[in-house]
């Protein structure tokens, strides 16, 4: 099993366990990081933030590092709190809780999102 298939298998397992809760889903690429808050039953995206957005990207020198992940974490938490979402389950999509994924999660917690 290669690295990508193993990550996707872990991600599917996590999604199955969290299917009845509001999820904060993280996806990362070499250049960008994406975060979405997804509704529990119908899998609709309620809130999204990423380094692709001009408002976030213009404040950053590089969109693929920890500073960018912190900016996305703060923005997604601010948007969630504005819509009345305070508690979510963290879905790291099979990625290790390390580096950019960890930075995004800690920034969201600092703003006030609970998970």
From Swiss-Prot:
UniProt keywords (A-Z) are: Ribonucleoprotein, Ribosomal protein, RNA-binding, rRNA-binding
An example Gene Ontology molecular-function term: structural constituent of ribosome
CDD domains the UniProt entry points to:
Ribosomal_L18_L5e
* A GO CC term assigned to this protein in UniProt: cytosolic large ribosomal subunit
State any GO BP term from the record: translation
User: Is Ribosomal protein set as a keyword in this record?
Assistant: yes
* Keyword RNA-binding included in the entry's annotation: yes
What Gene3D superfamilies does its record include?
Answer: 3.30.420.100
The annotated subunit structure for this chain is: Part of the 50S ribosomal subunit; part of the 5S rRNA/L5/L18/L25 subcomplex. Contacts the 5S and 23S rRNAs.
* Function noted in UniProt: This is one of the proteins that bind and probably mediate the attachment of the 5S RNA into the large ribosomal subunit, where it forms part of the central protuberance.
Q: What family classification does the UniProt entry report for this protein?
A: Belongs to the universal ribosomal protein uL18 family.
Q: What is this protein called?
A: Large ribosomal subunit protein uL18
Which gene is the coding source of this polypeptide chain? rplR
């Amino acid at each position: 099993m290669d690295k990508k298939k193993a990550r996707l298998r872990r991600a599917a397992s996590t999604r199955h366990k969290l299917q009845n809760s509001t999820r904060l889903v993280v996806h990362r690429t070499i250049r960008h990081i994406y975060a979405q808050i997804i509704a529990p039953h119908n899998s609709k995206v309620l809130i999204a933030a990423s380094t692709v957005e001009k408002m976030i990207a213009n404040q950053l020198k590089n969109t693929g590092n920890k500073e960018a992940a912190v900016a996305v974490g703060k923005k997604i938490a601010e948007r969630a709190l504005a819509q009345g979402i305070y508690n979510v389950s963290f879905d790291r999509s099979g990625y290790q809780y390390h580096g950019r994924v960890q930075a995004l999660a800690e920034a969201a917690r600092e703003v006030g999102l609970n998970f």
